[in-house]
Amino acid sequence: MRLAEELGLPLLIVIDTGGAALSKEAEEGGLAGEIARSLHDLIGLQTPTVSVLLGQGAGGGALALLPADRTIAAQHAWLSPLPPEGASAIVHRSTDFAPAMSEAQGVNVASLYTNGLVEHVVDERSDAALEAKAFCQRLGQAIEYELATLSLAPMTELLPKRLHKYRHLGRLVVSNGVS
């Protein structure tokens, strides 16, 4: 992140992670501190930022890379603080309720777009691998558009908007209508 800032280049972040292991070792390894540092650095970065949610975005690490100036998502991507199976196991002591938990969490791109977490959705077929070249071209066009748009705005305009986006993440309406 800092290198992009030092070189005066926009930062492009790709989010595609199943999340960290839910283990004592992960916590003892300083995961929470790294997530906090990433959030802090990204929010205050003095260069335009674009996050691209490609597939799964699970856990604090994925969420820490979300408050960019603009977020692009593949149509079938999803984002959650905890994978729906994990949430189901915690709440219901069974993974059988993962689809219901997914719906309640509003993890799909349609919900993320409606709630203002994603600004740009890139169309993909049932499996982007079936049309990899066309998908990559659409994704490239989306990235080019967002970077070009951001390059026209001064940092004095981008930073307050980025901070506002981050501060209001928890205040958005989720898919089941609850604020």
Q: What is the predicted function of each stretch?
A:
Residues 15-144, 148, 152:
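Conserved catalytic cores of soluble enzyme domains
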Residues 1-22:
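A structural preference for short, pocket-lining loop segments at secondary-structure junctions
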